[in-house]
Curated annotation (Swiss-Prot):
Keywords: Cell membrane, Membrane, Phosphate transport, Symport, Transmembrane, Transmembrane helix, Transport, Ubl conjugation. Mostly expressed in roots, especially in trichoblasts and in emerging secondary roots and root hairs, but not in root tips. Also present in hydathodes, axillary buds and peripheral endosperm of germinating seeds. One of its GO terms (molecular function) is phosphate transmembrane transporter activity. This is Inorganic phosphate transporter 1-1.
């Protein structure tokens, strides 16, 4: 790729931060808002689903989802997301980022609404249709990962590229927060309109029939922000790097970016030979890719896999951890609406105090500190705080020490988000060639979701008490919350070691990082 071909890409690399950058952040970021909202809102309503559809009047405890149903409801969207990341990642390189970007959003809108309209009033029918639609919701969400990251990286200038991609990803924190606020608002409204006694006072009346609408409204709300951004996604031009380096149309790329940057970019004559240079046409499964990027791909996949085991197991099962330490009262002392409110309040406080600030610390410092140092430090601090919670676990569960537990637990989330949860999303969008960028990001993200599935399914069983008398209905004894947290700490430490396989992209152009600029040096 000679210097002439780089004209339009250089213009993007050195462009001052301007309106189109922020427009791209909002368009891609609102997709991530929806992604996070849809994936995490289910953790707010699983206990409510148990009360409604698995009520047993003979039991001293409210109904709860059977183990296989809980695992399916929590994990099916993650399975869909993994599939979507691989499929749309590949498709984004084959057809272009823009062509498939709108399709992912349409899937999210339709499946969010359909999830809330899950058919029937019997447990089997509702759970089956809910899981079906949440799988396809996850499939659409999965496509948003590689496409949003790739589009933002290819639009950004090299000076603030990390902050722009991080800002898109930071909308995940806002989505988690929004899920909490929506649940708080909806449960408060229903509590005032349809007051009910606690389960201990009246088992049947503690779950009035109207609460069936609570979880449906919460789940369906995720469609709204996605719908608001669809028009603007369709108006975005294809990225210049895809048009020039993959579609081989430098003229169109120059015209598109001249409009976006609102400046004239000169079109050089010697372009075709550079763009079509055979040295840059190696495939994903070639020896050349293995030589250049094999360790990089191992680094991005392994770190994302290990991070998501810890991150998703903690996020999806916050309610179980908070119940175990007594931060959420025993279920029998609440009615169905109160339980939703208390779980949402706990999750919202964690998001507000640690999750959201962690994301925006990454936005603020990633282009000064660098991706590598932030990720390494994040894994290290997560390990420290996880062990600090786990080893003296019996100390933290005492009533007088619960605030300390919440502080320590919050700090693990802060350093996850001011750390590997953000950087594992950013780096794969920067270090691979344009024609494989979306695919490699999709592979890396899918490895992360594989870790999330391990966390979602594994933690559900592992965190059960070792005492058979204390396990949840239908579960075998596990290793307990304490030992589960120790295991997560060990995984965080291993993630820190694999970070050394990932290069530092700070301040470099995408072509310099991917090796696509090497041809120009050979030709000069």
């Amino acid at each position: 790729m000679a210097e002439q071909q780089l004209g339009v890409l250089k213009a993007l690399d050195v462009a001052k931060t301007q309106l189109y950058h922020f427009t791209a952040i909002v368009i891609a970021g609102m997709g991530f808002f929806t992604d996070a909202y849809d994936l995490f809102c289910v953790s707010l309503v699983t206990k409510l689903l148990g009360r409604i559809y698995y009520f047993n009047p003979e039991s001293a405890k409210p109904g709860s989802l059977p183990p296989h149903v809980a695992a399916a409801v929590n994990g099916v969207a993650l399975c869909g997301t993994l599939s979507g990341q691989l499929f749309f990642g590949w498709l984004g390189d084959k057809l272009g980022r823009k062509k498939v970007y709108g399709l992912t959003l349409v899937m999210m809108i339709l499946c969010s609404v359909a999830s809330g309209l899950s058919f029937g009033h019997e447990a089997k029918g509702v759970m089956t249709t809910l899981c079906f639609f949440r799988f396809w919701l996850g499939f659409g969400i999965g496509g948003d990962y590689p496409l949003s990251a790739t589009i933002m990286s290819e639009y950004a200038n090299k000076k603030t590229r990390g902050a722009f991609i991080a800002a898109v990803f930071a909308m995940q924190g806002v989505g988690i927060l929004a899920g909490g606020f929506v649940a708080l608002a909806v449960s408060s409204i229903f509590d005032k309109k349809f007051p009910a006694p606690t389960y201990a006072v009246n088992r049947a009346l503690s779950t009035p029939p109207q609460v069936d609408y609570i979880w449906r409204i919460i789940v369906m709300f995720g469609a709204l922000p996605a719908a608001l951004t669809y028009y603007w996604r369709m108006k975005m031009p294809e990225t210049a790097r895809y048009t020039a380096l993959v579609a081989k149309n430098i003229k169109q790329a120059t015209a598109d970016m001249s409009k976006v940057l609102q400046t004239d970019i000169e079109l050089e004559e010697r372009v075709e030979d550079d763009v079509k240079d055979p040295k840059q046409n190696y495939g994903l499964f070639s020896k050349e890719f293995l030589r250049r990027h094999g360790l990089h791909l191992l680094g991005t996949t392994s770190t994302w896999f290990l991070l998501d085991i810890a991150f998703y197991s903690q996020n999806l099962f916050q309610k179980d951890i908070f119940s175990a330490i007594g931060w959420i009262p025993k279920a029998a002392t609440m009615n169905a609406t109160h339980e939703v409110f208390r779980i949402a309040r706990a999750q919202t406080l964690i998001a507000l105090c640690s999750t959201v600030p962690g994301y925006w610390f990454t936005v603020a410092f990633i282009d000064t500190i660098g991706r590598f140092k932030i990720q390494l430090n994040g894994f290290f601090m997560m390990t420290v705080f996880m062990f600090a919670i786990a080893f003296p676990y019996n100390h933290w569960i005492k009533p007088e020490n619960r605030i300390g537990f919440v502080v320590m637990y919050s700090l693990t989330f802060f350093f996850a988000n001011f750390g590997p949860n953000a950087t594992t999303f950013i780096v794969p969008a920067e270090i691979f060639p344009a024609r494989l960028r979306s695919t490699c990001h999709g592979i890396s993200a899918a490895a992360g979701k594989a870790g999330a599935i391990v966390g979602a399914f594994g933690f559900l069983y592992a965190a059960q008490s070792q005492d058979k008398a204390k396990v949840d209905a239908g579960y075998p004894p596990g290793i307990g919350v304490k030992n589960s947290l120790i295991m997560l700490g060990v995984l965080n430490f291993i993630g820190m070691l694999f970070t050394f396989l990932v290069p530092e992209p700070k301040g470099k152009s995408l072509e310099e990082l991917s090796g696509e600029a090497e041809v120009s040096h050979d030709e000069k």
